[in-house]
From Swiss-Prot:
It comes from Bacillus anthracis. It catalyses: orotidine 5'-phosphate + diphosphate = orotate + 5-phospho-alpha-D-ribose 1-diphosphate. This is Orotate phosphoribosyltransferase. Its cofactor is Mg(2+). Orotate binds at S124. The lineage of its organism: Bacteria, Bacillati, Bacillota, Bacilli, Bacillales. Belongs to the purine/pyrimidine phosphoribosyltransferase family. PyrE subfamily. It is an enzyme of class 2 (transferase). Pathway: Pyrimidine metabolism; UMP biosynthesis via de novo pathway; UMP from orotate: step 1/2. It holds the Pfam family Pribosyltran. The keyword Magnesium applies. The keyword Protein transport does not apply. InterPro entries: OPRT, Or_phspho_trans_dom, PRibTrfase_dom, PRTase-like.
Length: 210
């Protein structure tokens, strides 16, 4: 499944690899990869495969789930499709409470004591997913864990998720993606090395000249 999803993401352009011409993230960090999983919304077969895969992850790891929660905004559509497949209630969680109306951070019902699984599109440092988890916990929900489409497998993300005491599972990951990209001839040996070095320490730009 990991390599299948990675292949889909590469084929539709949801993931770009440019180790020789790095992207600059909003944080200012240089990166050889850019991921925009919103593009999966435009490809019915891809999004259906993703929904089925996320459902499998949830059933395997969080079988007692009662509510599916999407992260705003990228996780909302996938959460909706998964909740529909599983015939479960769904809500979504904003990055912060609204500044008007009722000031809701959680939209839809997520009641005290309910067992919730968070659906996220991408795990990088884990920040947005953890914000979602914390809001649900503050509302009295029991957060079973997180499922996502893709993870960069960054140590910073793993450490934050562990510190937040939340389990996280992804359909595909950075390792599978680089392997598939190499198999497809998208990247060569030199590019593969740069990608591997970046993941070890993204903040150290020495990978650019690796």
């Amino acid at each position: 499944m990991k390599k299948e999803i990675a292949s889909h993401l590469l084929e539709i352009g949801a993931v770009f690899l440019q180790p020789n011409d790095p992207f600059t993230w909003s944080s200012g960090m240089k990166s050889p990869i850019y991921c925009d999983n919103r593009l999966t919304l435009s490809y019915p077969k891809v999004r259906q495969t993703i929904a089925a895969g996320l459902e499998e992850l949830i059933k395997e790891h969080f079988p007692t789930v009662e509510v599916i929660a999407g992260t705003a905004t990228a996780g909302i559509a996938h959460a909706a499709w998964v909740s529909d497949r599983m015939d479960l209630p769904m809500c979504y969680v904003r990055s912060k409470a609204k500044g008007h109306g009722k000031g809701n951070q959680i939209e839809g019902k997520a009641e005290k004591g309910q067992k919730v699984v968070v659906v996220e599109d991408l795990i990088s440092t884990g920040g947005s997913a953890i914000t979602c988890v914390e809001a649900l916990r503050e509302a009295g929900c029991e957060v079973l864990g997180i499922v996502s489409i893709f993870t960069y497998e960054l140590e910073a993300g793993k450490e934050k998720l562990e510190a937040a005491n939340v389990a996280s599972y992804s359909l595909s990951d950075y390792s599978a993606l680089t392997e598939v990209a190499a198999e497809k001839g998208i990247i060569g040996q030199a590019e593969t090395k740069k990608l591997q070095e970046w993941r070890k320490n993204p903040a150290d730009e020495a990978w650019i000249t690796a």
